[in-house]
Amino acid sequence: VQTCALPILSHSGWKGTVGKMGAATITAMKREFGTEAKDLVCAIGPSICQDCYEVSEDVADAFKETFPGHADEILLDKKNGKCQLDLWGANEIVLTEAGVLKEKIAVTNICTCCNPDLLFSHRASHGKRGNLGAFIYLRNA
């Protein structure tokens, strides 16, 4: 049994979220390390917020299919063929359905689109390319 903390970083945009990347990561951690989802502490890092994230009907339909019973929680219908998507909420659902305890999930609530001075945002830059980097490390106690 592994007794030390294993830092894992997993990226999930809208396609990864529809594909339940968080659950797939937990499954791989269980297989490779014997990790139990209930023992995990997870964080949902900076990304675009629901107010800034307008998606087309086909993307919204993919979320409705993947998250039956949760569409009203993660999609706001704009009545113009577009919806506002809550990726933070959708990923929280993925993690809790995979067995992570809700109280062990932290959401940064930092929107990349609202904070272009701090973080790159494809939407805020109107489609210009840029990069974000992330890292995680263990500090010796």
Predicted regions and their residues:
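Active-site microenvironment for binding and transforming phosphate-containing groups
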Residues: V1, A5-A141
